[in-house]
């Protein structure tokens, strides 16, 4: 019944408790969603979320699709909540370029997420929230080391660079292995062999060694990496809802265990390098970093001091940059080839015309193979197997498209949306490499720059350059000599499963045929 003061009167303690609870929830929602906004700016729009969990249910099993749909309603800059944490989501090519490139200093941070502290003991350059001068100097050091032992020329090599030498050896191994599997079984799953070959390339660059494909030590790395991607696929609400860290969570426990094992493995290999290190005889990236570390210790004025642990974490980051993304790219490429035999034939016709069958493809052939490049770009775009960049954060108060974004805000960058934007691509769901070619058959560089897979700006993937080159060379060598298909009557499932990278279902029904003319093993 009404009270004498015009407010509702409560007839029981239960009603009173319910009213107080409702008021508190309402106050909490207003509190967590309200931010002071400078005059002339607006808060990013977005849907209302549920108390305590925010938009966790809205994201669902395919966050890239859910957030793309929301961007169609709310625009290129929108805001959601995960738990009580506000997250700004960026879509649209121009908006993302504005944020990560033109305003790159504002958006170069990483959010201080709990799961990030578990990777490389919280010292990873890739995942660490630090974005200051020391981080920038270490990143340049890592980039230079990677360049020196991958794409820089070396007159002592028969190949143009270390990367070409390592990829050529592994591609030749795969050709022999696939032939053997066809003779013995008649079909196979290429992923289980690709992943080991790609791991061998980055092992050679980082550690100066190649493993046999049945080596248990190498297989342990491969298995850890596969498990890492599977475990991270479920995401970590504990990053945004702290109480979940203290509740039983099998995925979180597995994530912790995998990171400890991977870090221990890296530490073991690097300790071995310290033990066998000889100044003036630099074998690989790890030796290069050890030399830098020792030289800087003698120079008190050096601006980049490296501890032994920092050497481990840099190698950790470089290994990660050159492994999962490349394996996934080649694997998706093979899936598109067997489902589009016309495209496979066109690539092989181009290889025959430009290179022939008397020698092996080289990195220097890349500019003369525009259709193969167009195919790779379309694979990157259509699969968008890295749907989001690693989350960014703002390091200062800033604005974007008229919307105010405070310092320390977590920022998601939806690469999948850009690669499937109908305004950019017209028919984004069609797999059509020709879209990247001009009327004269050359590569359309302007359009190719609109594909986003490796991020942009100050935090873009450190392994982008070698990744693109490695995918190109593996495919060129394999397709020059072999034709890929699947067993008659079998279908491939290209439905992507969400994770750290989008993965297709494994297919055990691949077949290869050596191409009808030309030697099987060509001169490099």
Curated annotation (Swiss-Prot):
- What task does this protein carry out? A cytochrome P450 monooxygenase involved in the metabolism of various endogenous substrates, including fatty acids, steroid hormones and vitamins. Mechanistically, uses molecular oxygen inserting one oxygen atom into a substrate, and reducing the second into a water molecule, with two electrons provided by NADPH via cytochrome P450 reductase (CPR; NADPH-ferrihemoprotein reductase). Catalyzes the hydroxylation of carbon-hydrogen bonds.
Q: Which PANTHER family match?
A: CYTOCHROME P450 1A, STEROID 17-ALPHA-HYDROXYLASE/17,20 LYASE
List where this protein forms a coiled coil: none
Q: What does the entry list under GO cellular component?
A: endoplasmic reticulum membrane; intracellular membrane-bounded organelle; mitochondrial inner membrane
**Gene name?**
Cyp1a1
Give the UniProt keywords, A-Z.
Cytoplasm, Endoplasmic reticulum, Glycoprotein, Heme, Iron, Lipid biosynthesis, Lipid metabolism, Lyase, Membrane, Metal-binding, Microsome, Mitochondrion, Mitochondrion inner membrane, Monooxygenase, Oxidoreductase, Steroid biosynthesis
Sites where the protein binds heme: 461
Tissue-wise expression: Liver.
**Induction (UniProt):** By 3-methylcholanthrene (3MC) and beta-naphthoflavone (BNF).
Under the heading CDD domains, the entry gives: CYP1A (cd20676)
Stated family: Belongs to the cytochrome P450 family.
Query: InterPro entries, per this entry?
Result: Cyt_P450, Cyt_P450_CS, Cyt_P450_E_grp-I, Cyt_P450_E_grp-I_CYP1, Cyt_P450_sf
Q: Which GO terms describe its molecular function?
A: arachidonate monooxygenase activity; catalytic activity; demethylase activity; enzyme binding; estrogen 16-alpha-hydroxylase activity; estrogen 2-hydroxylase activity; flavonoid 3'-monooxygenase activity; heme binding
Q: Pathway, according to UniProt? A: Steroid hormone biosynthesis; Lipid metabolism; fatty acid metabolism; Cofactor metabolism; retinol metabolism
GO annotations under biological process? 9-cis-retinoic acid biosynthetic process; amine metabolic process; camera-type eye development; cellular response to copper ion; coumarin metabolic process; dibenzo-p-dioxin catabolic process; dibenzo-p-dioxin metabolic process; digestive tract development
Extent of the signal sequence:
none
**Cofactor(s) recorded in Swiss-Prot or TrEMBL:** heme
Q: What is its EC number?
A: 1.14.14.1, 4.2.1.152
Q: How is it modified after translation?
A: Two forms; MT2A (long form) and MT2B (short form); are produced by NH2-terminal proteolytic cleavage. This cleavage activates a cryptic mitochondrial targeting signal.
Q: Domain comment?
A: Contains a chimeric signal that facilitates targeting of the protein to both the endoplasmic reticulum and mitochondria. A 12 amino acid sequence between 33 and 44 functions as a putative mitochondrial-targeting signal. The removal of the first 4- or 32-amino acid residues from the intact protein positions the mitochondrial targeting signal for efficient binding to the mitochondrial import receptors. The membrane-free P4501A1 seems to be more sensitive to proteolysis.
Assembly notes: Both Cytochrome P450MT2A and Cytochrome P450MT2B interact with cytosolic chaperones HSP70 and HSP90; this interaction is required for initial targeting to mitochondria. P450MT2B interacts (via mitochondrial targeting signal) with TOMM40 (via N-terminus); this interaction is required for translocation across the mitochondrial outer membrane.
Q: Where is this region: Mitochondrial targeting signal?
A: 33-44
- Please give the residues the UniProt entry marks as glycosylated: 71
Positions bound to substrate? 228
Q: What is this protein called?
A: Cytochrome P450 1A1
Catalysed reaction(s)? an organic molecule + reduced [NADPH--hemoprotein reductase] + O2 = an alcohol + oxidized [NADPH--hemoprotein reductase] + H2O + H(+); estrone + reduced [NADPH--hemoprotein reductase] + O2 = 2-hydroxyestrone + oxidized [NADPH--hemoprotein reductase] + H2O + H(+); estrone + reduced [NADPH--hemoprotein reductase] + O2 = 4-hydroxyestrone + oxidized [NADPH--hemoprotein reductase] + H2O + H(+); estrone + reduced [NADPH--hemoprotein reductase] + O2 = 6alpha-hydroxyestrone + oxidized [NADPH--hemoprotein reductase] + H2O + H(+)
């Amino acid at each position: 019944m009404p009270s004498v003061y015009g407010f509702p009167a409560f007839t029981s303690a239960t009603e009173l408790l319910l009213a107080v609870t409702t008021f508190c929830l309402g106050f909490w929602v207003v509190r967590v969603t309200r931010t002071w906004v400078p005059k002339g700016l607006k808060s990013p729009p977005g849907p209302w979320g549920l108390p305590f969990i925010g938009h966790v249910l809205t994201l669902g099993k395919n966050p890239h699709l859910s957030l793309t749909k929301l961007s169609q309603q709310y625009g290129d800059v929108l805001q959601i909540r995960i738990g009580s944490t506000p997250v700004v989501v960026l879509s649209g090519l121009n908006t993302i370029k504005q944020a990560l490139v033109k305003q790159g200093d504002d958006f170069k941070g990483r959010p201080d997420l709990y799961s990030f502290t578990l990777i490389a003991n919280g010292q990873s350059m890739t995942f660490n929230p630090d974005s200051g001068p020391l981080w920038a100097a270490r990143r340049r050091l890592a980039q230079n080391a990677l360049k020196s032992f991958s794409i820089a020329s070396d007159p002592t090599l028969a190949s143009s660079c270390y990367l070409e030498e390592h990829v050529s050896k592994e591609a030749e191994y795969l050709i022999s292995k696939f032939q053997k599997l066809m003779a013995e079984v008649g079909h196979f799953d290429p992923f289980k062999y690709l992943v080991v070959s790609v791991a061998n390339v980055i092992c050679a660059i980082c550690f100066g060694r190649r493993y046999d494909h049945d080596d248990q030590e190498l297989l342990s790395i491969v298995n850890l990496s596969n498990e890492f991607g599977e475990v991270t696929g479920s995401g970590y609400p504990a990053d945004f809802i702290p109480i979940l860290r203290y509740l039983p969570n099998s995925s979180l426990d597995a994530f912790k265990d995998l990171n400890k094992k991977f870090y221990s493995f890296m530490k073991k290999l690097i300790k071995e390098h310290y033990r066998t290190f000889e100044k003036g005889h630099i074998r690989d990236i790890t030796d290069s970093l050890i030399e830098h570390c020792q030289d800087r210790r003698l120079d008190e004025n050096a601006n980049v001091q490296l501890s032994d642990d920092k050497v481990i974490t840099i190698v950790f980051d470089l290994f990660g940059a050159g492994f999962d993304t490349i394996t996934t790219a080649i694997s998706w490429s093979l899936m598109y080839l067997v489902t589009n035999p016309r495209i496979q034939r066109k690539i092989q016709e181009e290889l025959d015309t430009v290179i022939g069958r008397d020698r092996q493809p080289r990195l220097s052939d890349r500019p003369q193979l525009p259709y193969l490049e167009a195919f790779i770009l379309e694979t990157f775009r259509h699969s968008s197997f890295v749907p989001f960049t690693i989350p960014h954060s703002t390091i200062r108060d800033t604005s974007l498209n008229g919307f105010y974004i405070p310092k320390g805000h977590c920022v998601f960058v939806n690469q999948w949306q850009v690669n499937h934007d109908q305004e950019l691509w017209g028919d984004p769901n069609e797999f059509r490499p020709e879209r990247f070619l001009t009327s004269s058959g050359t590569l359309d560089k302007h359009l190719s720059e609109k594909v986003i897979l490796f991020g942009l700006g100050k935090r873009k993937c450190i392994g982008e350059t070698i990744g693109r080159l490695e995918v190109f060379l593996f495919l060129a060598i394999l397709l020059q000599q072999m034709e890929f298909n699947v067993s008659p009557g079998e279908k491939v499932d290209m439905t992507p499963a969400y994770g750290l990278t989008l993965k297709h279902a494994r297919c055990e029904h691949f077949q290869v045929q050596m191409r009808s003319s030309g030697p099987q093993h060509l001169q490099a």
